[in-house]
C-alpha cells in the first residue's frame, strides 16, 4: 500500500472518446502531470456536474468539437506515485456531431489527431495504459468498430 501524500485526495478525471469515421480524437498533453503523453480529451469533474455534462464541456473547451450520444465506457484507478496524485478516471464514449478539432488550450495540449486502436501514438498517458490493461478495453474497441 502506498502511504497518502499529506493533503492529497483522490480526484475524479473524465476521459472522453470522440468517435468519428472509425477513429477517435487524441491530444498530446502539456503543462500538467503526464506532459508529453497522449490521451483523449478530458478534465476534472466539477462539483454537481454529471459525467456526461463534464464530457461535453471538456471536449468543447479543449477542441471546439460538439459531441452527442455520450455514454459510460469504463473506469480506471490511477495512482501517479512519482507526482503524489491519485485519480479515478471515468472514461466516456461519444460521437462527433460537429466541428473540426482545434487546440483551444495550447498551454494544456500541443496537438490533436484522429487515431484508431491500431495506430496509437506513444507514449500514452498513465490512465490510458491502465485502460489498455483493463477488462473494459475490448468493449471500447467494439464500440469503435460498431461506429464505423
Question: Which residues are covered by each model-predicted region?
Answer:
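Conserved N-terminal beta-strand and adjoining loop/helix that marks the start
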Residues: 1-24, 75, 90-93
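A generic structural micro-feature
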Residues: 6-10, 37, 82-88, 106-109
